[in-house]
From Swiss-Prot:
Protein name from the UniProt record: GTP cyclohydrolase 1
Reactions catalysed according to its record: GTP + H2O = 7,8-dihydroneopterin 3'-triphosphate + formate + H(+)
Originating species: Brucella abortus (strain 2308)
Pfam families documented for this protein: GTP_cyclohydroI
Gene Ontology terms: biological process: one-carbon metabolic process; tetrahydrobiopterin biosynthetic process; tetrahydrofolate biosynthetic process
Gene that specifies this protein: folE
Enzyme class, broadest EC rank: hydrolase
EC assignment: 3.5.4.16
Record family assignment: Belongs to the GTP cyclohydrolase I family.
Amino acid sequence: MDARILQDNDDTSLPVNQASVTRIHKKPGKAEAEAAVRTLLLWAGEDPDREGLLETPKRVAKAYQELFGGYSESPEEVLGTTFEEVAGYDDMVLVKDISFFSHCEHHMVPIIGKAHVAYLPEGRVVGLSKIARVVDIFARRLQTQESITAQIADSIQRILKPRGVAVMIEAEHMCMAMRSIRKQGSSTITTTFTGDFKEKADQQVRFMTLIRT
């Protein structure tokens, strides 16, 4: 669940996730973020004043702006431009093997995987790159794999209003590989279907067959 983030200048234009908002937080400034990283270095037993770590707080804060850039983007903007002159094409549009990375909301360690996304157009289509961008918008947030899967499908269904959407995500979770049970190489698969993909088994079979070919 996202909290609305207020900019230092009280700009409330950043998109809010569809989940209900229970808290409103003021976004910390860059200096506060860097100070927080410095505190973590001290807590880990490091000396933030040694040569190799002097610029680390600044670098981490800058990296987080990119890694969690999905909070400042909205699928509505990405999927807002569509095309209707597609020669009557109304069959499945599938973009598969979309590589992505995200971060587990429980431990803030990476989730690395691939997404396969399909939809059945209802008179209009979007540029193929837009589907990949929607994946990145939700991946570049603190997430669970189940949430990313559902959010991708929901946004495409809600904005494009196709006859159906299918999403499969295959990913490795570093919280399982690097800590706790330390099971390297294990993968998690999640799926969600809407519309015809949910109601018609043959459409699900087509989707699953195509992503495996």
